[in-house]
């Protein structure tokens, strides 16, 4: 198309037709040529079904954790609005009419989880309190005008059952200037006359109300402008008698932030009540307890993989949502990289799948390190059968999977019992949380550790009431399981409780040890001290333990035997690779990225990411065809704290000129030198933007280097 025209100054070019990018189904990623793709679709389907179960359990868990908090909030809102509806004529009631009911919701610093909580809270308030629930964020409210504009539009969107006349009123409200007067008049004409839809539960609780309240949720209150909050609260308090507003402050830090943002003259207009959500660590403990410390889900994490997820949670974001995403990534990586993960399902289904295993899949079982160790410990005849007979191998694999299932049932029951014993000990030698105890048990035989020995010594000093309380908790744990694997253990513990109850509470008389002195004899201090020490040693060696001490020792020995029998590390179990994900490094690379290392790698060795053969170079060499920023970066690594821009530019031009093989005497090279200079300026600007250099006032033609070392 010609672009030379006297009359035209703008030329239109139709874009080239591009083929629509074909989306690849996610299950096709399991068909990797580098990996064995046998049963890839079945593996993906197993992963999908298992994740749906975990996701459903997680959603139910979060609803249960927030249920108590939401119930308290609903009670507060209903009570506050009911008191507002009582038109008392006394002076105190008139003063309270200017106080806006406010709920300060302390959610913690895990801001990424707040959206889920606010969505659930909004739905709960819609169903139980009022249809007028609005959530605002600080980015949408830079001033009072935008604050009221956003509030008005959200309130209008909340009304879903209105006639055409009311819609005209809404359009008129949108066209008018946004103010609290117009909003109050709209509310009086629409909300009170329309009678919005209510559920039967809400109608029963709110039948005495003349009009439903307006609940305004301010997400992350710390982000709002102080002036905007102050002005809005003052204006709203003056219209509270005609616009029943209730505020909910979402606070991530501390309730003190309310008094820091609002002066006393403004905070006195609020009737504040605090509500505390469950702490992040307690939430994590519950999630681990329901998802990993249970035989309900066959998928498990190794010690290192679990530590990666918990460390990211504890030292980075405190986000339960990110922890669950990490768990999902672990599940996906396990089914993607482990061909035998097809057996990571319910026991009955796994047995059916083993029956149809091919020869290749049977060979994969034989190659498992845990199975090879198991074969080496078997008699010679059984070894030959396991290595040559496919039918016998399938039967033995089914038996081993069943043993692994029983192992997990007993493992988690005994783990909880041990946690009941050790969670209240001084200084918590085995950890305060069950996840700490679980990580220790995953790593090694816990009874070989010094912490375990110190815990047993402390347990041998427990009082009768403390010991009986712990044993009762253990009985509840063992009876909570539908399996009958440890039923004898529960009966044994009940027997210990019966023996404790039958003990005589009175102190037992101690037998007199040693002969009584015949008479008082004069002696010096040395011989007196020697005699007292001998008598003390004699009492210690000849003293008999009481019945309680003997029974307590029996209980501790019984628990010790349980731990040694059932808390064996999972790495010693045959076929543990089928259900345990242990690629902690892969998980760390995906979730705990190091941007500075990645940036250094990209600039220092562009071939690592671009995969261009021309970018390959020896260590310490600068490829002449590398991107400009890579050349400038590698040159700046050779400089000291201050970099001369002239020398840097000449070195850059030398490298680029070597790449393009230009003749320095030609006019083209002179023109190209300007282009090279512009390229250098752009590369330096990009390095400054990335934070590698900065201008300095020491020398005008120098820049200061900001980074040192390899990255």
UniProtKB/Swiss-Prot annotation:
Keywords assigned by UniProt, alphabetized: Chromosome, DNA replication, DNA-binding, Nucleus, Phosphoprotein, Ubl conjugation
Post-translational modification remark: Multi-mono-ubiquitinated by OBI1; ubiquitination is important for efficient DNA replication origin site activation. Ubiquitination levels are low in mitotic and early G1-phAse cells and are induced in late G1-/early S-phase, peaking in S-phase and decrease toward the end of the cell cycle.
GO cellular component: chromatin; DNA replication preinitiation complex; nuclear origin of replication recognition complex; nuclear pre-replicative complex; origin recognition complex
Single GO molecular function: DNA replication origin binding
A Pfam family annotated for this UniProt entry: ORC_WH_C
Keyword hit for Acyltransferase: no
Keyword DNA-binding: yes
Residues with the Phosphoserine modification: 23, 515
Superkingdom as given in the UniProt entry: Eukaryota
Protein localization: Nucleus; Chromosome
Gene Ontology terms describing biological process: DNA replication initiation; glial cell proliferation; neural precursor cell proliferation; regulation of DNA replication
Stated role: Component of the origin recognition complex (ORC) that binds origins of replication. DNA-binding is ATP-dependent. The specific DNA sequences that define origins of replication have not been identified yet. ORC is required to assemble the pre-replication complex necessary to initiate DNA replication. Binds histone H3 and H4 trimethylation marks H3K9me3, H3K27me3 and H4K20me3.
Subunit structure: Component of ORC, a complex composed of at least 6 subunits: ORC1, ORC2, ORC3, ORC4, ORC5 and ORC6. ORC is regulated in a cell-cycle dependent manner. It is sequentially assembled at the exit from anaphase of mitosis and disassembled as cells enter S phase.
Family listed: Belongs to the ORC3 family.
UniProt protein name: Origin recognition complex subunit 3
Species assigned in the record: Rattus norvegicus (Rat)
Name of the encoding gene: Orc3
């Amino acid at each position: 198309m010609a672009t030379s025209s006297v009359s035209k100054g703008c030329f239109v070019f139709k874009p080239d037709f591009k083929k629509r990018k074909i989306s690849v189904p996610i299950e096709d990623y399991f068909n990797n040529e580098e990996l064995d793709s046998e049963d890839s679709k079945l593996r993906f389907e197993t992963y999908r079904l298992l994740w749906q179960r975990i996701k459903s359990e997680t959603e139910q868990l979060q609803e249960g954790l927030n249920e108590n908090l939401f119930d308290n909030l609903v009670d507060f809102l209903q009570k506050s609005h009911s008191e507002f509806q009582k038109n008392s004529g006394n002076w105190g009631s008139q003063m309270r009419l200017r106080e806006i009911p406010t709920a300060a919701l302390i959610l913690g610093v895990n801001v990424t989880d707040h959206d889920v909580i606010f969505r659930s809270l909004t739905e709960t308030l819609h169903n139980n309190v009022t249809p007028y629930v609005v959530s605002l964020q600080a980015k949408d409210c830079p001033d009072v005008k935008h604050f009221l504009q956003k509030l008005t539009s959200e309130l209008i969107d909340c009304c879903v059952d209105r006639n055409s006349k009311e819609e005209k009123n809404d359009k008129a409200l949108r066209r008018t200037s946004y103010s609290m007067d117009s909003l109050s008049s709209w509310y009086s004409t629409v909300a009170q006359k329309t009678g919005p839809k209510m559920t039967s539960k809400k109608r029963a609780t709110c039948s005495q109300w003349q009009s439903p309240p307006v609940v305004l949720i301010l997400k992350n209150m710390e982000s709002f402008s102080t002036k905007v909050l102050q002005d809005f609260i003052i204006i709203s308090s003056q219209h509270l008698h005609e616009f029943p507003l209730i505020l909910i402050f979402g606070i991530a830090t501390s309730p003190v932030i309310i008094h820091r943002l609002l002066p006393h003259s403004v905070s006195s207009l609020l009737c504040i009540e605090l509500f505390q959500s469950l702490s992040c660590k307690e939430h994590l403990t519950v999630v681990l307890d329901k998802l990993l410390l249970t035989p309900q889900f066959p998928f498990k994490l190794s010690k290192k993989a679990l530590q990666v997820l918990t460390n990211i949670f504890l030292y980075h974001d405190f986000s339960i949502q990110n922890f669950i995403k990490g768990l999902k990534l672990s599940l996906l990586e396990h089914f993607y990289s482990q061909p035998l993960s097809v057996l990571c399902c319910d026991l009955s289904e796994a047995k059916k799948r083993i029956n149809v295993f091919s020869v290749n899949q049977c060979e994969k079982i034989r190659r498992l390190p845990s199975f090879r160790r198991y074969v080496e410990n078997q008699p010679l005849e059984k070894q030959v059968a396991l290595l040559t007979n496919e039918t016998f191998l399938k039967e033995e694999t089914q038996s081993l999977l069943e043993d692994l299932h029983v192992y997990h049932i007993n493992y988690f029951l005994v783990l909880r019992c041990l946690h009941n014993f050790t969670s209240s000990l001084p200084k918590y030698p085995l950890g305060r949380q069950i996840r700490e105890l679980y990580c220790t048990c995953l790593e090694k035989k816990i009874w070989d550790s010094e912490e375990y020995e110190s815990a047993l010594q402390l347990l041998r000093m427990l009082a009768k009431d403390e010991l009986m309380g712990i044993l009762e908790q253990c009985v509840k744990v063992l009876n909570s399981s539908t399996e009958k694997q440890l039923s004898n253990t529960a009966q044994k513990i009940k027997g210990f409780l019966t023996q404790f109850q039958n003990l005589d509470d009175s102190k037992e008389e101690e037998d007199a040890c040693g002969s009584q002195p015949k008479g008082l004899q004069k002696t010096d201090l040395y011989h007196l001290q020697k005699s007292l020490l001998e008598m003390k040693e004699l009492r210690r060696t000849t003293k008999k333990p009481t019945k309680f001490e003997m029974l307590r020792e029996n209980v501790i020995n019984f628990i010790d035997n349980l731990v040694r029998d059932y808390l064996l590390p999972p790495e010693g179990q045959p076929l543990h690779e089928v259900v345990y994900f242990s690629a902690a490094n892969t998980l760390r690379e995906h979730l705990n990225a190091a941007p500075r290392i990645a940036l250094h790698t990209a600039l220092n060795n562009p071939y690592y990411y671009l995969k261009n053969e021309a970018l390959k170079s020896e260590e310490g060499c600068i490829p002449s065809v590398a991107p400009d920023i890579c050349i400038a970066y590698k040159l700046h690594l050779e400089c000291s704290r201050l970099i001369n821009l002239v020398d840097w530019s000449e070195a850059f031009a030398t490298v680029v000129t070597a790449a393009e093989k230009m003749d320095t005497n030609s006019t083209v090279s002179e023109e190209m030198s300007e282009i090279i200079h512009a390229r250098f300026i752009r590369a330096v600007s990009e390095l400054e933007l990335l934070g590698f250099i900065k201008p300095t006032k020491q020398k005008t033609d120098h820049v200061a280097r900001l980074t040192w070392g390899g990255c």
